[in-house]
Amino acid sequence: MDRVDGRKQGQIRPVRMTPNYNKYAEGSVLIEVGDTRVICTATVEERVPPFLKGLGKGWVTAEYSMLPRATGSRTIREAARGKLGGRTMEIQRLIGRALRSVVNLEALGERSLTMDCDVIQADGGTRTASITGAYVAMIFALNRLVEQGMLEKIPVSDFIAATSVGIVKGRPVIDLCYAEDSVAEVDMNVVMTGTGRFVEIQGTGEEATFSREEMNQLLDLAAAGIEELNKVQRQVLGDIAAKIG
């Protein structure tokens, strides 16, 4: 049986990345995963957080937000509420952790990269799309530092991408759209490297449980999907991709 949008069980949504989407940022990309769209920008600053001052190493962090009408009904801006929501804080920490897992912070030197992931349209998988797009924006920014002679080489050991998987109506599926995510019995986000190593797995039963066998099926789906995402990343980066690792 096909899914709500006609996809097969192990088929990710169409992925498109538009590089240099923001003319001011050191690195940027608009990532589109189905109807989910996220603008990812990288900002380089020649300073580090106070806890890293004088240690000779850099930092990579992330911020995440959604436009009020990124969803079906308008949501109040978090700035208007006066504080970040728990979901937002969790997602931006996830993005930062994922990117730092492959960055040599010592080789980066005492400078910071701030990744801004702004969702302009949400249809499921915004956090995983943010990670996949932010990685590309980060590489563009680091390559600029290399070209300017500020870094000897791109201090990144591997590719990073992420996707969602879940169990919907008893079937393991990949890259859930909102309609699927809202009724999923199991929801899981998976972040992996280009060499197939796991960075993070977030899995939850929604009023349901799942077996070790089902979890393995979900991870196999995620690994195959992330391999496809890596191919898109390589295509967008072009010759820069060969400088990674």
Curated annotation (Swiss-Prot):
- Tell me the Gene3D superfamilies matching this sequence: GHMP Kinase, N-terminal domain (3.30.230.70)
Q: Which CDD domains match?
A: RNase_PH_bact
Query: Which keywords describe this protein according to UniProt?
Result: Nucleotidyltransferase, RNA-binding, rRNA processing, Transferase, tRNA processing, tRNA-binding
Which superkingdom?
Answer: Bacteria
For whether the record's keyword set contains tRNA-binding, the answer is yes
Q: Which GO terms describe its biological process?
A: rRNA catabolic process; rRNA processing; tRNA processing
InterPro entries attached here?
A: ExoRNase_PH_dom1, ExoRNase_PH_dom2, ExoRNase_PH_dom2_sf, PNPase/RNase_PH_dom_sf, Ribosomal_Su5_D2-typ_SF, RNase_PH, RNase_PH_bac-type, RNase_PH_CS
Q: Which residues bind phosphate?
A: 87, 125-127
The EC number(s) given in the record are: 2.7.7.56
Q: Name one Pfam family in it.
A: RNase_PH_C
Q: Write out the catalysed reaction.
A: tRNA(n+1) + phosphate = tRNA(n) + a ribonucleoside 5'-diphosphate
- SUPFAM superfamilies in the record: Ribonuclease PH domain 2-like, Ribosomal protein S5 domain 2-like
Assembly: Homohexameric ring arranged as a trimer of dimers.
What the entry lists under HAMAP family is as follows: RNase_PH (MF_00564)
Described by its record, this protein's role is as follows: Phosphorolytic 3'-5' exoribonuclease that plays an important role in tRNA 3'-end maturation. Removes nucleotide residues following the 3'-CCA terminus of tRNAs; can also add nucleotides to the ends of RNA molecules by using nucleoside diphosphates as substrates, but this may not be physiologically important. Probably plays a role in initiation of 16S rRNA degradation (leading to ribosome degradation) during starvation.
**Family label:** Belongs to the RNase PH family.
Q: Return the protein name.
A: Ribonuclease PH
Which species does the entry assign this protein to? Desulforamulus reducens (strain ATCC BAA-1160 / DSM 100696 / MI-1) (Desulfotomaculum reducens)
